[in-house]
């Protein structure tokens, strides 16, 4: 992205110095976004290959005789189950650890959280630089793992992204070990980033900006940072035990030596359930700002919105075993986790109805960011979440495509749509150039139709009893699988179109000549700065009237 030249120091920064050695929070945020986009492209390519295989019954593409991109009915094809497992595993690992959190927390969080609170930079700029390059190392390790020797004398670890033992402890080759190291490094970069965010938020707010005057996106990133800080060390301990079981003869998860594989499930999901809220909370913050801007109204219920995010974060830590209803828990335990899980619907409902109340009576402008916010179908995932929170119903739905549909409505039509909303909302601010509105709207409709075509039919497949993570299925399931795969092709085409939109915008987009190119309801501090912001922002700290409407109108 082109930088605005504001002084002679900036003119001396070459390309290498700026992008490889930068400690500037804005540049590091952009780096996070681009790297997450690259990891996302790899991950969705794996997704499309999965959906190609599942479009029709029988195995057509993933053959032991060799991978194919074109089905050949005349040629023999022995199913390559390891390749299938590898594709499933790395799609999950990349998306969960290297795409959504780095984009929302590392990208938008790094770039805009300091701007929202009027801070000149992050509290620890060099730590910020270290966090990013550790993230690059993590992505590199994950891709190296995909290409390294694994089980069945083939590349990659085919154990699922959750790395459950005994599959993960018995998988041959060192691809599994590299995957564990990739997750470790991902955890380290997130923990360092979280420490930085928390310190910045607590110590570097503009004069007069008390806690409950901080914009909702900054609050969302701050709460997410606490969740990362409290949950990722637990995951680190669990996968270290896994590494020890694989290489040093310990038996933490081996019943033959007194271990217990269910212990690993508890450790993993104590991290894994807060993880889904870490992925979605920054998205909640973005959606709040977008809806407020394009409904031309202040956000409804600011304080309940903050408290709802804090409640979601707290409750997220005490519901982990709802992933484990079928793992032999007592009825008493299941009853507790069932009730606690349904309780999360209350603060989530507060947020959803506050967004609706913000739009109610507003003068709504259907620009591209607002379309993404309106299509933020996290709510559909939330409704199916209440269904599978019931232990009795989960007996039926566990490990079926109903779970896949539930999870992807939360992640794909939730977190991913929030990333797109944030990109279109802020790309003019970050680059100084605006996207073509028609292209943004076309991308939205392609992705919206494609995503719903993929995941909505999967509810039906789950209801019919189709288990997830299988390379083949009976012909009875073929109708909805075919529709789901068509949706995947439409979504993939829309993602490639989005990449084109981003590069067109950066190099040929219409220049933005004003700080605030939306309207007066885009009222956080970044809209007082030039587009793009200069390298050094808020060297003179902002005054209350710059960000507080009550002060400005006195």
Curated annotation (Swiss-Prot):
UniProt keyword annotations, A-Z: Cell inner membrane, Cell membrane, Copper, Disulfide bond, Electron transport, Heme, Hydrogen ion transport, Ion transport, Iron, Membrane, Metal-binding, Respiratory chain, Translocase, Transmembrane, Transmembrane helix, Transport
Cross-link annotation 1'-histidyl-3'-tyrosine (His-Tyr), location: 273-277
Cofactor(s) required, per the database record: Cu(2+); heme
Topology in membrane: Multi-pass membrane protein
Positions annotated to bind Fe(II)-heme a: 91, 408
Main location: membrane
Intracellular or extracellular location(s): Cell inner membrane
EC number(s) recorded for this UniProt protein: 7.1.1.9
PROSITE patterns named in the record: COX1, COX1_CUB
Family listed: Belongs to the heme-copper respiratory oxidase family.
Role according to the record: Subunit I and II form the functional core of the enzyme complex. Electrons originating in cytochrome c are transferred via heme a and Cu(A) to the binuclear center formed by heme a3 and Cu(B). This cytochrome c oxidase shows proton pump activity across the membrane in addition to the electron transfer.
PANTHER family: CYTOCHROME C OXIDASE SUBUNIT 1
Protein known as: Cytochrome c oxidase subunit 1-alpha
């Amino acid at each position: 992205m082109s930088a605005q030249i504001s002084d002679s120091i900036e003119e001396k920064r070459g390309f290498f110095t700026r992008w490889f050695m930068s400690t500037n929070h804005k540049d590091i945020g952009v780096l996070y976004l681009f790297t997450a986009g690259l990891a996302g492209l790899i991950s969705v390519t794996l997704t499309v290959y999965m959906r190609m295989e599942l479009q029709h019954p029988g195995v057509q593409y993933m053959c032991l005789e060799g991978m194919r991109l074109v089905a050949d009915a005349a040629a023999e094809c022995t199913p390559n189950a390891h390749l299938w497992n590898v594709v499933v595993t790395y799609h999950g690992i990349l998306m969960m650890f290297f795409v959504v959190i780095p984009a929302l927390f590392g990208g938008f969080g790094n770039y805009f959280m300091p701007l929202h609170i009027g801070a000149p930079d992050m509290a620890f700029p060099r730590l910020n630089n270290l966090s990013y390059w550790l993230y690059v190392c993590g992505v590199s390790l994950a891709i190296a793992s995909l290409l390294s020797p694994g089980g069945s004398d083939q590349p990659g670890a085919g154990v699922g992204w959750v790395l459950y033992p005994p599959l993960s402890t018995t998988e041959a080759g060192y691809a599994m070990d590299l995957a564990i190291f990739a997750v470790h490094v991902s955890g380290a970069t997130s923990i360092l980033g979280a420490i930085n965010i928390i310190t910045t938020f607590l110590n570097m707010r503009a004069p007069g900006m008390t806690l409950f005057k901080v914009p909702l996106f900054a609050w969302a990133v701050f709460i997410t940072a606490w969740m990362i800080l409290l949950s990722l060390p637990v995951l680190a301990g669990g996968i270290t035990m896994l590494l020890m079981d694989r290489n040093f003869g310990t038996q933490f998860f081996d019943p033959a030596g007194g271990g217990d594989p269910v212990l690993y499930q508890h450790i993993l999901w104590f991290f894994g359930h807060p993880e889904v809220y870490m992925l979605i909370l920054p998205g909640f913050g973005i959606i709040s700002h977008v809806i407020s801007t394009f409904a031309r109204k202040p956000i409804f219920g600011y304080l309940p919105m903050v408290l709802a995010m804090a409640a979601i974060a707290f409750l997220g830590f005490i519901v982990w075993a709802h992933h484990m209803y079928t793992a032999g828990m007592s009825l008493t335990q299941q009853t507790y986790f069932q009730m606690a899980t349904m309780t999360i619907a209350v603060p989530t409902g507060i947020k959803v109805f506050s967004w609706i109340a913000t739009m109610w009576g507003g003068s709504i402008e259907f620009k591209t960011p607002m379309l993404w916010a309106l299509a933020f179908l996290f709510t559909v995932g939330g409704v199916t979440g209440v269904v599978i929170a019931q232990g009795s119903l989960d007996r039926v739905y566990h490990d079926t495509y109903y779970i896949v549909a539930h999870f992807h409505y939360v992640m794909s039509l939730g977190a991913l749509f929030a990333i797109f909303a944030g990109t279109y909302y802020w790309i003019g601010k970050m680059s100084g150039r605006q996207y073509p509105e028609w292209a943004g709207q076309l991308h939205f409709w392609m992705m919206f139709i494609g995503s719903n075509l993929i995941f909505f039919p999967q509810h039906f497949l789950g209801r019919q009893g189709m288990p997830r993570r299988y390379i083949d299925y009976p012909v009875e399931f073929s109708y909805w699988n075919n529709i789901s795969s068509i949706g995947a092709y439409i979504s993939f085409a829309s993602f490639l179109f989005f990449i084109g939109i981003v590069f067109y915008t950066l190099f040929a987009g219409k220049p933005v000549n004003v700080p605030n190119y939306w309207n007066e309801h885009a009222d956080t501090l970044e809209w007082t700065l030039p587009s793009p912001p200069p390298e050094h922002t808020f060297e003179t700290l902002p005054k209350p009237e710059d960000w507080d409407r009550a002060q400005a109108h006195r």
